[in-house]
Amino acid sequence: MALEKLGQALNSALKKLARSSTVDEATIKEIVRDIQRALLQADVNVKLVLQLTKQIQKRALEEEPPAGVSKKEHIIKIVYEELTKFLGTEAKPLEIKHKPTVILTVGIQGSGKTTSVAKLARYLQKRGYKVGVVCSDTWRPGAYYQLRQLLDPFGIEVFGDPEEKDAVKLAREGVEHFREKGVDVIIVDSAGRHKEEKGLIEEMRQISEAIKPHEVILVIDGTIGQQAYNQAMAFKEATPIGSIIVTKLDGSAKGGGALSAVAATGAPIKFIGTGERIDDLEPFDPKRFVSRLLGLGDIQGLLEKIEELQKEQEFREEDMEKFLRGKFNLKDMYAQLEAMQKMGPLKQILQMIPGLGYSLPEDAVRVGEEKLKRYKVIMDSMTEEELENPEIINYSRIKRIARGSGATTAEVRELLNQYNQMKKMFKSLNKRKLAKMAKKFNFGGLGI
């Protein structure tokens, strides 16, 4: 997940609260100091940190929990609510109201703008929109080929001409090209040659006059931390229809600083980049984001990922029911492992399940992902009968499977043990239990 270290530090503070024998003023102040340290290490502005934690401490000391809720649970709820408010409270989804809707993207050099354009195009395509992408980056000819490489596999057309030096002309011709083709959304990738806000905004103004976009999106590099405030503020003042994508949140200790800095300007954050895969772009919802950050899960996000796979006929509903009941064989397990890999990294999935977010060390998760790939190779060496009836796999079959897959007999036995454990685990981790875990804190942002 984005902001891994910040999430672990905040989760650690809440665990300290949960383990404490009493909840007095000293305990609350200690937890607040832990939260302050976590936020400052994530490059969140000192003034913002002090404002936030002062409010958390004030509420924790003054408020009485409602009937049936413990003091500890109420304090966790206060932390959740204040962090959510800190990052903007409500989600601000991208609206596609016109046909075609024209979106202009701008960003400082190195912000991850071109990759974000490809991710946004894919995101919209998966939601049923016909998308065209215009590359008007005349400063970096490689941008056109980069977009082609990313989007050709998905059948998303990229309009561009690496030889053309007039960015405004390219943008105008590209938009006209896709209007004639009747697409739903046109995304224009502008040049990322500027290293400061003034030049960026001037280019945005020129291209905007030429193509009249319905939405202008600024792409901000999450690794710059609280410096993002200046970019976001300059952008907000320059355009009344602006929104923001914050990128590279998966690999930066300063991501919290960038998110909080942008939120402080009031400019709407609509998406965040959470990884290198083309599908690693997610709508920014402060409630669900903070819920995952605190280790409280995101059931709605998990179910949405499953629904996406269902639409792509990779993850049938009846298969999911078998999975949750523990009534599945190795053939089902193989199909589900393939589908789960398409949902994203294992760590991201675990963080959507309440209580599992930070329970496994990073090394263990990485080893787990490698083992999943190994298990698929082993299952490829099994017969159809063995996949459908794992109970018939005896020692002689284990030896044959090991030889065929280049594995050891111990690895094959390990796979079979994992299969049996997964049956038990998913049988106990049914939807009702997940909902109960999430409802414990009565958080509206969990979507339950």
Curated annotation (Swiss-Prot):
Subcellular location: Cytoplasm
Key words of the record: Cytoplasm, GTP-binding, Hydrolase, Nucleotide-binding, Ribonucleoprotein, RNA-binding, Signal recognition particle
GO function term, MF aspect, one: GTPase activity
Binding site for GTP: 107-114, 189-193, 247-250
Annotated GO CC locations: signal recognition particle
GO biological process, one term: SRP-dependent cotranslational protein targeting to membrane
E.C. number: 3.6.5.4
CDD domains, per the entry: SRP54_G
Catalytic reaction equation(s): GTP + H2O = GDP + phosphate + H(+)
Entry keyword annotation includes Hydrolase: yes
PROSITE patterns: SRP54
UniProt main location, coarse: cytoplasm
Pfam families found in the cross-reference section: SRP54 (PF00448), SRP54_N (PF02881), SRP_SPB (PF02978)
InterPro entries: AAA+_ATPase, P-loop_NTPase, Signal_recog_part_SRP54_M_sf, Signal_recog_particl_SRP54_hlx, Signal_recog_particle_SRP54_M, SRP/SRP_N, SRP54, SRP54_GTPase_dom
Enzyme class name: hydrolase
Function description: Involved in targeting and insertion of nascent membrane proteins into the cytoplasmic membrane. Binds to the hydrophobic signal sequence of the ribosome-nascent chain (RNC) as it emerges from the ribosomes. The SRP-RNC complex is then targeted to the cytoplasmic membrane where it interacts with the SRP receptor FtsY.
Notes concerning its domains: Composed of three domains: the N-terminal N domain, which is responsible for interactions with the ribosome, the central G domain, which binds GTP, and the C-terminal M domain, which binds the RNA and the signal sequence of the RNC.
Family: Belongs to the GTP-binding SRP family. SRP54 subfamily.
HAMAP family (alphabetical): SRP54
Subunit structure: Part of the signal recognition particle protein translocation system, which is composed of SRP and FtsY. Archaeal SRP consists of a 7S RNA molecule of 300 nucleotides and two protein subunits: SRP54 and SRP19.
Protein name (Swiss-Prot/TrEMBL): Signal recognition particle 54 kDa protein
